[in-house]
Design a protein with these regions (language model features):
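Multi-pass alpha-helical transmembrane bundle typical of ion/small-solute transporters
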Residues: 2-208
Length: 208
């Protein structure tokens, strides 16, 4: 609860219930950060490359994740609040849209922050895999491991591309349609699967 509330501990049942409304947005904000951590952990476990460039990328990744935490948490709160209004889920509403500090005119800035963060995080992860391919002979990388590197480079490339689209949408549409900049991310459930499949369909590692 301290992690969710950051600066306050619930001192009554009412405060505990109110604070619990932030749990869904906290979980939602952890998902992209968790995905980045899993990707880096998987890369490190499989390849374990420790050259200077990989160490630099690891440090840069840590810095970006720490910077990325607050925009991601805010966009997660907005997402949960949005769906609580759409579906009349009052038990999840935190009153964010009614607060004095809320400005619908500036929501696009939050989408911009999140998109830029995702783009840079994706580029760093792509750099990990592409740098690994450069050390293919030294690491005795197998064909399956080569495919692994290419696959995840494509996946994170799709994430970066989707973030660019979200940023463009957020910059163009009116505040009333700003949710479109968020809806575009749902396409990742489809594109991150289809793009690698199509890539290897037309560019197989072993020519038939």
């Amino acid at each position: 609860m301290l992690v969710i509330s950051i600066d306050q501990i619930p001192r009554s049942p009412e405060e505990l219930i109110q604070l619990s409304k932030y749990i869904p947005s906290f979980v939602l904000s952890v998902l992209p950060i968790g995905s980045v951590w899993i990707a880096h952990s998987s890369w490190s476990r499989i390849f374990g490359l420790q050259d200077r460039f990989s160490v630099f990328l690891s440090l840069l990744l840590v810095v970006l994740v720490l910077v990325f935490v607050y925009p991601m948490k805010l966009i997660a709160q907005i997402t949960v609040e949005y769906f609580s209004v759409i579906f009349d889920w009052n038990f999840l509403s935190t009153g964010l849209f009614e607060s004095e500090s809320w400005s619908s005119e500036l929501v696009w800035v939050i989408f911009l922050y999140v998109a830029i963060g995702l783009i840079f995080l994706s580029l760093i992860l792509i750099a990990f895999y592409q740098n690994t391919l450069k050390f293919g002979q030294e690491l005795s990388i197998t064909e399956e491991e080569t495919k692994h590197c290419i696959t995840f480079s494509l996946i994170w490339g799709v994430v970066a591309g989707t973030a660019v689209l979200s940023m463009l949408i957020a910059s163009i549409v009116s505040p009333e349609n700003i949710q479109l900049a968020g809806y575009i991310y749902f396409s990742l459930f489809f594109t991150t699967v289809v793009v690698p499949i199509q890539y290897f369909k037309y560019r197989p590692l072993t020519p038939s």
